[in-house]
């Protein structure tokens, strides 16, 4: 985990990561007690919906767009968890959100560029990114404590 670190939005260090600094949005969707994961291609690992910022988008708009584009999910509310600062392969900042969802798409609703959508009680294997578990643990901690 030397290449990535999570900073909670409740931490004073979070001020170092203003929204304009975020290049990626990562969303941890919960379907009840299960987490929703996607696999973009069959040979890659599982990941949370994640996308890069397009010209003119806010990071919140990126998160909403990616939820729809990768999982056909519309969330009524996105809660900001914090940021992940990654240094490998190049420095980047990701804003991490979580949300509650009421609907998970059927197989015929899955976007063409997504191989699978799954709901899990634990982290599935293989993971596309090692820091997915760090992000999941932060989201689970927020759900347990109720501190958002």
Task: Mark where each language-model region is.
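A short coil-to-beta-strand element that immediately follows conserved catalytic motifs
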Residues: 73-83
């Amino acid at each position: 985990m030397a290449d990535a670190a999570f900073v909670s939005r409740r931490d004073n260090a979070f001020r170092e990561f203003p929204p304009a600094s975020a290049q990626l949005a990562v969303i941890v969707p919960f379907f009840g007690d299960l987490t929703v994961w996607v696999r973009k291609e069959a040979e890659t690992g599982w990941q949370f919906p994640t996308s890069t910022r397009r010209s003119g988008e806010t990071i919140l708009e990126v998160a909403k767009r990616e939820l729809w584009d990768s999982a056909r999910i519309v969330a009524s509310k996105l809660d900001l968890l914090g940021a992940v600062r990654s240094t490998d392969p190049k420095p980047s900042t990701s804003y991490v959100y979580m949300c509650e969802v009421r609907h998970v798409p059927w197989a015929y609703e899955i976007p063409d560029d997504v191989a699978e959508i799954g709901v899990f009680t634990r982290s599935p294997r293989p993971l596309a990114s090692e820091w997915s578990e760090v992000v999941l643990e932060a989201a689970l901690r927020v759900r347990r404590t109720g501190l958002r």
